[in-house]
Regions:
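Short, solvent-exposed loop/turn and secondary-structure capping segments
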Residues: 132-136, 199-200, 281
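Extracytoplasmic substrate-binding proteins
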Residues: 120, 164, 177, 181-275, ...
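Bacterial Sec-exported substrate-binding components of ABC uptake systems
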Residues: 40-129, 240-266
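Bacterial N-terminal signal peptides that target proteins for export
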Residues: 4-26
């Protein structure tokens, strides 16, 4: 009887050993699967932030464009994947890419690459400053082509007084060393730069992209105002720019719908030398008077843009 008991006891012990093994194996397998799934999930989450460039320019095409109401001196095209092509005038093109994305293969040398949002701007075109102020994007400007005393906009003057924006020389004599040391991402020049093309060429040789602000060439007065939409794209504040532009257009809708009053108006200014300048009929001031329902005089002042 004792032998039978001992045999049964040994059998129970032998059967008890393998019984725990499947449990441990199942637990190990479940743990391994959970680790694999976690790894897959981590890789999926990380992939978007590691985008560099898998594009070839020849295979890329616009999927949409900014619907401009008045401006004709710039255009903005959407190429998908947060890639934007900006054209200024007839030939200056800029490809605005997400941060850390490299340029597409086969991109023509005539297209300048910018990384969004554009930072440490060297702002020479004074007419653009108001747009940056309204967009609350002064922090994207590091350098100014106008001295502190030359600004009539209090926000710009204060930024220079506080050292947030530094003077880097006027359009014809920029401080190249200061511009380079500031890691300048873009120089926004006025059309005066066309009188000193060697400066533009030198900036570009140093790797500083140059965008010439052509709002003064707009045929419609409200085309100038629409440039805020371009600066919204450059600074990553598209929604703010659209809202500001819409608000301004809406506020003028009643005026634009008015029947011409038949009243005449003249506009002139006195220069530092004491001479009197009269705006010509093709000037934006004359067109603004016409939009308001008036008639600009003198009517035989010519049709050129300048005074």
């Amino acid at each position: 009887m004792d032998n039978i008991k001992n045999h049964l006891f040994r059998q129970k012990r032998k059967s008890a050993i393998p019984c725990g093994q499947p449990v441990r194996w199942i637990a190990a397998i479940l743990l391994l699967l959970s680790m694999i799934c976690a790894g897959c999930s981590a890789k999926t989450e990380e992939s978007p932030s590691n985008i560099t460039s898998a594009h070839n320019w020849d295979d890329m095409a616009p999927v949409g464009s900014m619907d401009l109401l008045y401006a004709d001196q710039f255009s903005v095209e959407d190429y998908g994947d947060d890639i934007t092509l900006i054209t200024i005038g007839e030939s200056d093109r800029f490809l605005l890419l997400p941060e850390n994305m490299s340029a597409p293969d086969g991109l023509p040398d005539s297209i300048t690459v910018l990384q969004k949002p554009v930072k440490n701007i060297y702002l020479v075109a004074t007419s653009a400053m108001d747009a940056f102020i309204r967009l609350n994007a002064l922090d994207s400007i590091a350098l100014s082509g106008t001295k502190e005393s030359g600004w009539y906009l209090p926000e710009a003057k204060s930024a220079m007084e506080e050292g947030k924006i530094a003077y880097a020389g006027k359009y014809s004599a920029p401080d190249y060393e200061k511009i380079l040391n500031s890691s300048c991402g873009l120089a926004v020049e006025s059309t005066m730069i066309y009188h000193t093309p060697e400066v533009k060429e030198q900036l570009e040789r140093l790797g500083i992209p140059v965008l010439v602000e052509r709002s003064s060439y707009e045929n419609h007065p409200l085309g100038r105002m629409e440039w805020i939409r371009l600066y919204g794209v450059l600074t990553g504040k598209e929604e703010e720019a659209e809202a500001i532009f819409k608000q301004n257009v809406d506020s003028l809708s009643d005026v634009l719908d008015m029947v011409p009053s038949g009243k005449t108006a003249a506009f002139f200014y006195v220069t530092n030398s004491g001479s009197v300048n009269v705006r010509k009929n093709g000037d934006y001031i004359a067109k603004m008077i016409a939009l308001a329902g008036g008639t600009y005089v003198p009517e035989n002042g010519g049709s050129d843009e300048n005074a």
